[in-house]
């Protein structure tokens, strides 16, 4: 695997020097300063690429070129935003950047309720608490019809939880959910959030798939033409939330994508921490079935709690993800490619890490502190080395 590291640009508290010292050779970044929908010019791409290369690294993957909400709702200037997206792909290819991670999650990107969940060893992790989320949706957001998405016991627990919350607790929970986490290009006030949710009132899973298919049929031929590989990121968490449909959550969703636009430019990001939240997602089977179309991997683990819809981010080699079998399947796919004459390594980043050690005293991006990811990268690197030596050493 090609070892990479997500970097949020010049304002990231983790520097490119830090990235190189961590042992990564590739950088995963994006032009976050360009508003959603606007074209990434060759000049802007080259500026960022030069910064990365001056540090002795390579810009390996774009994460992400965000998709304008008009495209997802098929309203407003969606055709203009698609044309702009096509041009951005052409410009990236012109600059020698050929792997693009993106997602099709409506309104919200990845979602957590607690950004400072304290683990038994004193480090901090990210957590999604189903009951806290229900308390937000039922008692703060007050979304009409939300009760239908929860069991009677969850509704009762959410009411009790909400009753114990201070005003600061409520404000923090609201911020965590709607203000935008790292990599999310949209953040909202509560009123704005309600307005955006309302735009999906008549959009169910089938309708959102129609809109996604329209996007894929416009984008993938351009990607194919210029040699760009599109790698869709799964929904996080991988299930409907807030009354919004989610359509990249299961192996069935992956199969639908391939059948909708059967081009090798239409591929996947294997994010084990997203897909792995669902007990019915067999990650190794996903890799084996769609290995040739996996162009990027996020390797991390989560641990489901007593309520299986509640989870926290576990250490990379622990939790519900069998990281050994996942890495073995990825390495086997790379060797399959090599046997067919390709030296195409799959970029891997350790994804979220725990906030720990000296980083507990620093301001960090949630999930993206340096030391926790350094630990995760080192652990995954060790697993890969052992697999390579045990099964593929001549």
From Swiss-Prot:
Pfam families: UxuA
Keywords: Iron, Lyase, Manganese
EC number: 4.2.1.8
Coiled-coil residue spans: none
Pathway: Carbohydrate metabolism; pentose and glucuronate interconversion
A molecular function (GO) term: ferrous iron binding
Enzyme class: lyase
InterPro entries for the chain: Man_deHydtase, Xyl_isomerase-like_sf
Keyword Lyase included in the entry's annotation: yes
Reaction equations catalysed: D-mannonate = 2-dehydro-3-deoxy-D-gluconate + H2O
Recorded superkingdom: Bacteria
Cofactor: Fe(2+); Mn(2+)
Gene Ontology biological process: D-glucuronate catabolic process
Keyword Lyase assigned: yes
SUPFAM superfamilies: Xylose isomerase-like (SSF51658)
Annotated family: Belongs to the mannonate dehydratase family.
Cited function: Catalyzes the dehydration of D-mannonate.
HAMAP family on file: UxuA
Name by which UniProt lists this protein: Mannonate dehydratase
Species classification: Bacteria, Pseudomonadati, Pseudomonadota, Gammaproteobacteria, Enterobacterales
């Amino acid at each position: 695997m090609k070892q990479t590291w997500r970097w949020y640009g010049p304002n990231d508290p983790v520097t490119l020097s830090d990235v190189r010292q961590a042992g990564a050779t590739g950088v995963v970044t994006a032009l976050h300063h360009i508003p959603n929908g606007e074209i990434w010019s060759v000049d802007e791409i080259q500026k960022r690429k030069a910064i990365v290369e001056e540090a002795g690294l390579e810009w390996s993957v774009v994460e992400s070129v965000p998709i304008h909400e008009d495209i997802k709702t098929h309203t407003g200037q969606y055709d203009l935003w698609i044309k702009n997206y096509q041009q951005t792909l052409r410009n990236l290819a012109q600059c020698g950047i050929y792997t693009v991670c993106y997602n099709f999650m409506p309104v919200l990107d990845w979602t957590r309720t607690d950004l400072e969940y304290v683990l038994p060893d004193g480090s901090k992790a990210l957590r999604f608490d189903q009951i806290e989320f229900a308390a937000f949706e039922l008692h703060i957001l007050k979304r009409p019809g939300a009760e239908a998405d929860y069991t009677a016991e969850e509704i009762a627990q959410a009411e009790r939880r909400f009753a114990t919350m201070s005003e600061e607790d409520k404000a923090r929970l609201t911020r965590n959910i709607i203000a935008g986490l790292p990599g999310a290009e949209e953040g909202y006030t509560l009123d704005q959030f309600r307005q955006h949710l309302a735009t999906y009132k008549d959009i169910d899973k089938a309708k959102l798939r129609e809109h996604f298919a329209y996007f894929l049929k416009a984008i993938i031929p351009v990607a194919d033409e210029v040699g760009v590989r599109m790698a869709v990121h799964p929904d996080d968490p991988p299930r409907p939330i807030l009354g919004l449909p989610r359509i990249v959550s299961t192996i069935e969703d992956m199969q639908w994508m391939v059948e909708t636009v059967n081009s090798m430019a239409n591929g996947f990001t294997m994010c084990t921490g997203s897909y792995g939240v669902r007990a019915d997602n067999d990650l190794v089977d996903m890799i084996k079935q769609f290995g040739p179309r996996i162009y990027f991997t996020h390797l991390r683990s989560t641990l489901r709690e007593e309520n299986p819809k509640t989870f926290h981010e576990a250490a990379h080699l622990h939790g519900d993800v069998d990281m050994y079998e996942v890495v073995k399947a990825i390495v086997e796919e790379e060797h399959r490619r090599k046997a067919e004459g390709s030296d195409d390594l799959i970029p891997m980043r350790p994804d979220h890490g725990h906030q720990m050690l000296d980083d507990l005293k620093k301001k960090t991006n949630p999930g993206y502190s340096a030391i926790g990811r350094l630990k995760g990268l080192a652990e995954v690197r060790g697993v890969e080395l052992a697999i390579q030596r045990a099964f593929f050493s001549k």
